[in-house]
Amino acid sequence: MALREIIILPDKRLREISKPVAEVTPEIRKLADDMFESMYEAPGIGLAAIQIAEPVRLITMDIVRKEGNGKSDPRAFINPEIVGASAELNVYEEGCLSIPEYYAEVERPKTVRIRYTDLDGQVKEEDADGLFATCIQHEIDHLNGVLFVDHISKLKKAMVVRKFEKAAKRGIKYV
């Protein structure tokens, strides 16, 4: 495993649309391992490959760690897609490792049904709700070049983007 640098707004690579993974290879498994290590170090509960400048449709998550009970449930999702979503919405305060120290309430479907391939190459479908639903939608957005600030008001988004652009010009690195 290797710790990888997480790219930060306004890095334009965050807006790239990630390419599908054709096959689960040892390289994809190693990338997932690197992503878990980088995600835990940050610390975070979800990471899309594009956030470490790898434009492939791979997500790692461990939402159990957020509960602070010392347990862990690392999961990888290859080529994840939402195949169904509830009409009922939920509001959750989101943050992002690529937009450090900024949080905002985002409204998303309360439950979603996802289809993905696991690291063993098995295609699966699963229902997600609560934090899992919020996190998987947030990470799938990354694979499509969408950031959580795209879901907030234009004024708030403009303010946060400007803040990160100014910091980048001054060479400030968020850690």
Swiss-Prot record:
The active site is at 139. It is an enzyme of class 3 (hydrolase). CDD domains: Pep_deformylase. Its cofactor is Fe(2+). InterPro entries: Peptide_deformylase, Peptide_deformylase_sf. It catalyses: N-terminal N-formyl-L-methionyl-[peptide] + H2O = N-terminal L-methionyl-[peptide] + formate. Fe cation binds at residues 96, 138, 142. It holds the Pfam family Pep_deformylase. Its EC number is 3.5.1.88. Binds 1 Fe(2+) ion. Keywords: Hydrolase, Iron, Metal-binding, Protein biosynthesis. One of its GO terms (molecular function) is peptide deformylase activity. GO terms for biological process: co-translational protein modification; translation. Belongs to the polypeptide deformylase family. Removes the formyl group from the N-terminal Met of newly synthesized proteins. Requires at least a dipeptide for an efficient rate of reaction. N-terminal L-methionine is a prerequisite for activity but the enzyme has broad specificity at other positions. HAMAP family: Pep_deformylase. This is Peptide deformylase. The lineage of its organism: Bacteria, Pseudomonadati, Pseudomonadota, Alphaproteobacteria, Hyphomicrobiales.
